[in-house]
Amino acid sequence: AQYAKENGITLIHNNTTAVLEGIYLKRKLKLPLIWHVHEIIVKPKAISDFINFLMGRYADKIVTVSNAVANHVKQSRFVKNDQVQVIYNGVDNAVYHEIDASSVRDQFGIAQNALVIGMVGRVNAWKGQGDFLEAVTPILQVNSKAVAFLAGSAFDGEEWRVDELEKAISDSPAASQIKRIDYYSKTTELYNMFDIFVLPSTNPDPLPTVVLEAMACGKPVAGYRHGGVCEMVKEGENGLLATPNQPAELSKTIQELADNTEKREQFGKASVKRQKELFSLESYIKNFSDLYKI
């Protein structure tokens, strides 16, 4: 509070539902509070209700990263609809853009004419690596030029998840066509190496940034129809979505893109256009600048 006073701070921005200090500052200094919500908290319900109660009572404006998050927050009896505003996260196109990835393919020992189906995500309980393997295996089995590529590590203490995943890969009938690496910092290179980007999250991801990054790199997207991806992907325009947690249906959407080079290119161009129009860093900054003028 002392710091806020001394530095002439006139507005508080609480980032994520885990940050509660803004309430104290708002009450002590009588400043407006913007609460920025990135998560969809369903369980435990008591925690969800408590956070919604605090937001409803103290936030002058609740900003959510997607309509999926906004709709979840609005379901609470503690929150008024006009308290909630959606501001999509932006992607920096100076970092994420189309590049020639032939050298990246060489680096990973992938043929230039291979069809690369990729996913990027932490190895945890719900990012869906198991569903990804289940969905891509039949495609790999009928197409010897297809390669499945997974990138991502586990949290410290959960390395067993990686061991399980590695075992699932080695046990796969298409093991020789599946490659997995740990966390890789130059994700732009990976997205550009992919022909199809897949988001197989088994729980609704509020706003999966990896999808926006892949779109910025000109990729068609396949995924499950829940969470924020439904706002990023316009079905039939820059991607295809399947019923959540149905790997066989997800497989069909990937297959549809795998079979049609023209559709992949068309969807990829549409991805770039859509990302720049709706999910750019510029629009993100402008939307917050306008909001800060309250």
State what each model feature region is.
Residues 4, 183-184, 190-194:
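Short alpha-helical donor nucleotide-sugar binding micro-motif in glycosyltransferases
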Residues 91, 120, 147-163:
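Glycosyltransferase donor-sugar binding loop
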Residues 71-78, 82-83, 90-107, 113, ...:
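Acidic anion/phosphate-binding donor-loop and adjacent secondary structure
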Residues 220-223, 233:
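Short hydrophobic beta-strand element within catalytic cores of glycosyltransferases
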Residues 103-106, 249, 256, 263-278, ...:
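A short, well-ordered alpha-helix in the C-terminal region of glycosyltransferases
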Residues 115, 119, 124-138, 240, ...:
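A conserved mid-protein helix/loop that constitutes part of the nucleotide-sugar donor-binding site
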